Regions:
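Gram-negative bacterial Sec-dependent N-terminal signal peptides
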Residues: 1-22
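Short active-site-adjacent helix-start/loop capping segments
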Residues: 59-60, 74-80, 115, 131-136
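Outer-membrane beta-barrel porins/channels
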Residues: 23-34, 42, 86-88, 92-93, ...
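Surface-exposed strand-loop-strand hairpins of Gram-negative outer-membrane beta-barrel proteins
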Residues: 39-46, 75-104
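Transmembrane beta-strand segments of Gram-negative outer membrane beta-barrel proteins
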Residues: 26-41, 59-78
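Outer-membrane beta-barrel pore proteins
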Residues: 42-44, 51-64, 113-119
Length: 412
């Protein structure tokens, strides 16, 4: 392998935290072929992206392989505010504020390298986003008091060791170095002391708040694959939960002018997950993959932020708590790959994601319900290089969630 090309790929991996991100929370778009097959790509031959989809399958790589992937994601959506206080007895006079999100596209970048050490051992490393999102709404909309800008940049670096025990069994274990960079903005009302000639009064002040910080944390993964015969194979992948202790900067900009700052701190646990996959080869040209992913989103039970060392004492609360109480969810995917020749192939896929966000735990940070993803792709390869392209369309279902309980409103 060209050492300069490898150095370029590792540099791209280090830059990934700055560019990875898409609306949503979990990212599955780790390669063009993976996108084309709906994420059901756990048993690909000679594919360095197996580091991400199924580390045990890096034993299918012959020699030394490197791969880079760039997926462009462009989310579009709309919402409506419902005021329950305006319902009549027939429930047919709902007053709503229809509007939409600001399109905030992002890139999911992946870089992978796999090397066969000998007939039994392989080493691989990948840098790709497992969790990321960007959502933005108009600053003057009614959504802005919930969140008008939310961004989670994320990347995982996963050094992996794999061993092939025999013709049937392969297994892998790896570490995960996970980075997250978080930024949240919303409009908020705060209680502030105001001096008058007679006394000091507490006034309600409108302002914009911003929380920005980053964190690194460690996790691990393990995988195993078993081939029944030349045509049928199963695999399982486990990825551990990762706990981030996030130190951040808090800023508030009152409408009247000025700035209030404070130190912010929060703990967030990213969920662990299980992938179960099945691969069937109809013949030497066509194969089908099935995949089910269980993500334990119940670890995201709250987003609680503590504030300390404010620049203006007595204004900010010591804690800003937000219950989430997400439920565990499943993602199901099916992918088909057909090789027309030794050089050309086509792929198609479908995936269904369950909704995990409850009515009283939704927000405009991740305003998405169940998802259906339809995708197609094509690939060209020769003995030294592979080029693939894919196109996916995600149909995101409606998510209804609570607005401000004291006002009795809600969003959809």
């Amino acid at each position: 392998m060209n050492k300069n090309f490898l150095a370029l790929g590792l540099a791209a991996a280090l830059l990934a935290p700055q560019v990875a991100g898409a609306e949503g929370f979990a990212i599955n778009e780790w390669s063009a072929e993976g996108v084309a097959m709906g994420g059901a790509r756990m048993f690909a031959e000679d594919d360095a992206a197996n580091v991400a989809y199924n580390p045990a399958s890096i034993t299918k790589v012959k020699g030394e392989v490197m791969k880079s992937s760039y997926t462009y994601l462009s989310p579009h959506g709309n919402y409506k505010l419902y005021d329950y206080k305006l319902y009549d007895s027939n429930n047919d006079e709902i007053k709503g504020e229809p509007t939409h999100n600001k399109v905030h596209a992002g890139w999911a970048v992946g870089t992978y390298y796999v090397r066969q050490i000998n007939d039994k051992e392989w080493f691989g490393i990948g840098a790709f986003p497992r969790f990321a999102m960007v959502s933005e709404f108009e600053r003057e909309s009614k959504a802005s008091s919930n969140a008008f800008f939310s961004k989670l940049n994320g990347v995982s670096v996963t050094p992996t060791y794999a061993h092939k025990f025999d013709k049937k069994w392969s297994a892998a274990v790896g570490a995960e170095i996970n980075y997250v960079g978080l930024e949240l903005q919303k409009n908020l009302q705060m209680k502030m002391p105001v001096e008058t000639p007679v006394e000091t009064k507490i006034a309600t002040i409108d302002g914009t708040t911003q929380i920005e910080g980053e964190s690194y944390a460690l996790g691990w993964n393990a995988a195993a694959s078993y081939a029944f015969d030349d045509k049928n194979e199963i695999g399982v992948v486990y990825r551990s939960r990762i706990t981030h202790s996030l130190e951040a900067d808090f800023k508030m900009y009152p409408a009247s002018g000025g700035k209030i700052t404070a130190d912010a701190y929060g703990v967030v646990t990213l969920p662990d997950s299980w992938d179960i996959g099945y691969n069937h080869k109809f013949d030497k040209k066509t194969r089908l993959e099935l995949k089910a992913t269980r993500t334990n989103w119940s670890t995201y039970d709250a987003l609680n932020i503590s504030l300390s060392n404010p620049s203006v004492p007595g204004v900010l609360p010591s804690n800003v708590d937000s219950a989430k109480n997400w439920s565990n969810g499943w993602r199901y995917a099916i992918g088909l790959e057909h090789n027309f020749s030794d050089k050309y192939a086509a792929m198609a896929g479908f995936a269904f994601d369950e909704a995990s966000i409850p009515y009283n735990g939704g927000d405009f940070m991740v305003p998405t319900g169940l998802r259906r993803t339809y995708s197609i792709g094509a690939r060209y390869n020769d003995k030294k290089q592979t080029v693939a392209v894919a196109l996916g369309w995600m149909d995101v279902g409606t998510l209804d969630f609570e607005g401000h309980p004291e006002k009795g409103d809600a969003y959809s």
